[in-house]
């Protein structure tokens, strides 16, 4: 086994004495820092490399702190108006994961960079911490490499806002097989539109 495989196995045993101590100390350290800051290097080099990170120019790691829990509806004094079915304010659950929220915040802060992927690095009772891999699309090392040229194209601007990253795709219900019938055709909306459109063919 290579070194990265050993690191991977260490991270799989998060309840071991060593990892519990490490995660507690790291959470304390991350809480002292700002909610969004640049990390000098990935905390989990094995995971970062599996997600596409390379230790070379053009790659950046940002660490994001996201508050845990559901999403409260942002209305003044709970005044939602309308019908009682839509009066809920407190016990609502956000459709996307906290990881995708972290990616979005990193993408907003670093508007010139492209979000490649992200991974979990720790959590406590109040916060979850994620590290986001960002790429500089105008760096020559990225533009000249055939493996990374794809992310320099304009179509990949703010892919984290449009649910195109790995964490973003998970909440869209995409997949193959009988469990994913509600997104046949590319999205929930496409599936709904096809099922709710009456087609009267000329020859039927």
Curated annotation (Swiss-Prot):
GO terms for cellular component: cytoplasm; cytosol; cytosolic large ribosomal subunit; cytosolic ribosome; nucleus; ribosome; synapse. Its main location: cytoplasm. One of its GO terms (molecular function) is RNA binding. Pfam families: Ribosomal_L15e. Keywords: Cytoplasm, Diamond-Blackfan anemia, Isopeptide bond, Lipoprotein, Myristate, Phosphoprotein, Ribonucleoprotein, Ribosomal protein, Ubl conjugation. Residues 165-186 are annotated as: Disordered. The keyword Protein biosynthesis does not apply. GO terms for biological process: cytoplasmic translation; translation. PROSITE patterns: RIBOSOMAL_L15E. Residues 169-182 have a biased composition (Basic residues). Component of the large ribosomal subunit. Interacts with IFIT1 (via TPR repeats 1-4). It is linked to Diamond-Blackfan anemia 12: A form of Diamond-Blackfan anemia, a congenital non-regenerative hypoplastic anemia that usually presents early in infancy. Diamond-Blackfan anemia is characterized by a moderate to severe macrocytic anemia, erythroblastopenia, and an increased risk of malignancy. 30 to 40% of Diamond-Blackfan anemia patients present with short stature and congenital anomalies, the most frequent being craniofacial (Pierre-Robin syndrome and cleft palate), thumb and urogenital anomalies. PANTHER family: LARGE RIBOSOMAL SUBUNIT PROTEIN EL15 (PTHR11847:SF4), RIBOSOMAL PROTEIN L15 (PTHR11847). This is Large ribosomal subunit protein eL15. It comes from Homo sapiens (Human).
